[in-house]
Amino acid sequence: MRSGILSKVKRIVIKIGSGVLTCGDNGLNKPLMGSIAAQVAELRASGRQVIIVSSGAVAAGRKELGIDGRPRSIPQKQAAAAIGQSRLMHAYEEAFEPFGHKVAQILLTRDDLAHRGRFLNARATLDTLLSFGVIPIINENDTVVFDEIKFGDNDSLSALVTNLAEANLLVILTDIDGFYEANPRTNPDARLIPLVRQITREMERAAGGSGSTVGTGGMVTKLAAAKKAGQFGVPTLMLNGRNPSLLAEAFAGREVGTLFLPGKESLNRRKHWIAHTLRPSGKIIVDDGARTVLARQGKSLLPSGVVRVEGKFDRGACVRVCGTDGTEIARGLVDYSHDEITRILGHRSGEIEAILGYKYGDEIIHRDNLVVL
């Protein structure tokens, strides 16, 4: 199964974590970066296109600034990113130069992908770089980002880039051998799971916390990334990036690491963008009847099923749809503002025009703009 999946792959997103790229407090691990570059060059020689999502800027910059451990404040982190990003890119240039490959830097924030026009422009830029044989190196723009526009971690970013780039495989290089049934750092008898057909809540609960002192992600965020990628039909391969040949071995047919299979019912790319890239502006609380219809039948959300509205938002905004118990059941783009929904909630669609004096449509959220979670 694995060899059949990997043999069909043409465009790959490879996420490389800080725990792989750095030598603890001693900055970037340039010999290992050279090994990764050699393996990526093999993939390119086989006709595959590669995009790298790379952590490491903050870790590289903190050494230059003499900061021990993780930066203690956001300004410190952003200063470390500012000095470290140029050093990170220079290290990639040095790593790929022996193989004749050029690299390009792309720095993103969530806003860049949430705005549909900028999203499509970023996709066009990626396509153009790849057509010239360039290897894009993508990172979050840590120097200017703040909570409202940050991805949170590069695992999440890598899953979104997989959608952005229309890739057909996500590879996560981490500092352990793959996904285990328990934390291998605290349980030496933990068993590696080579194949995951479905990410369960039990797996998410067992995933634990952050794995290193230099990164912000842990197994929880890696599972979330694999789940997001799987929702639009893309498998994820998790490998130990500290092994200097494991990436090449995986594509040579050796069953290493953990392969996460995509879900049977995948989202189209637009719905994936709605569910995972847009930041919700508010909440719409629905009754049990509407909850059942949305979850089981994939219908549009009508005003008759709405109980109340939380937050302020305009028409076209992304909102959470929640049950009366607070559980989020869907996300979608609204056809009416918070004020308009407040006025028409609980009413039949045929009454909308009489209440508002106009009507955009029968639905609060049309099913084409609604993603059940």
UniProtKB/Swiss-Prot annotation:
Pathway: Amino-acid biosynthesis; L-proline biosynthesis; L-glutamate 5-semialdehyde from L-glutamate: step 1/2. It catalyses: L-glutamate + ATP = L-glutamyl 5-phosphate + ADP. GO terms for biological process: L-proline biosynthetic process; proline biosynthetic process. The keyword Glycoprotein does not apply. It is found in: Cytoplasm. Its EC number is 2.7.2.11. GO terms for molecular function: ATP binding; glutamate 5-kinase activity; RNA binding. The keyword Phosphoprotein does not apply. Substrate binds at residues 55, 142, 154. InterPro entries: AceGlu_kinase-like_sf, Asp/Glu/Uridylate_kinase, G5K_ProB, Glu/AcGlu_kinase, Glu_5kinase, Glu_5kinase/COase_Synthase, Glutamate_5-kinase_CS, PUA. Belongs to the glutamate 5-kinase family. This is Glutamate 5-kinase. It comes from Geobacter sulfurreducens (strain ATCC 51573 / DSM 12127 / PCA). The lineage of its organism: Bacteria, Pseudomonadati, Thermodesulfobacteriota, Desulfuromonadia, Geobacterales.
